[in-house]
Amino acid sequence: RSTLQNSYDDDDVLWWGYEADLASRIALLQCAEVFVLPSLVEGLSLALLEAMASGCACVATDAGADGEVLAGGAGIVMSTLGVTSQLRTLLPVLRDQPVLTQELGRQARRRVLDRYTISRNIDALEQLYGDLMRRAPLAA
């Protein structure tokens, strides 16, 4: 983080860090144009899903499931190798191409609403259980 902060020490980039308060976090995400998650180790990031739901253009590494969540145009996926150099290339592009940034934000929001809401996940889990019950005979 400090290397990137030194490269982008101006008003174009706000280095916020962790925000525990949910209302503040939502307000920040709704104002943000880009959300960056440069994790080297990750599962499925709730912060990434929150940013996507807020309509931020999202950039994350392919650590854990984050790359899968952003695949297919819902965001930009980076390798966990050479994150700093990748961000040095990507951040100016996202800053200078507002149409691209806005479209990535729209695609991110669409993806999270299509696949990652609680009701969608409950429906999918119920479907899975139903499929399993129809296939497997019950033991006596």
Where are these regions (language model features)?
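Short hydrophobic beta-strand element within catalytic cores of glycosyltransferases
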Residues: 57-60
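Short alpha-helical segment that forms part of, or immediately flanks, the ligand-binding pocket
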Residues: 26, 45, 49-53, 67-68
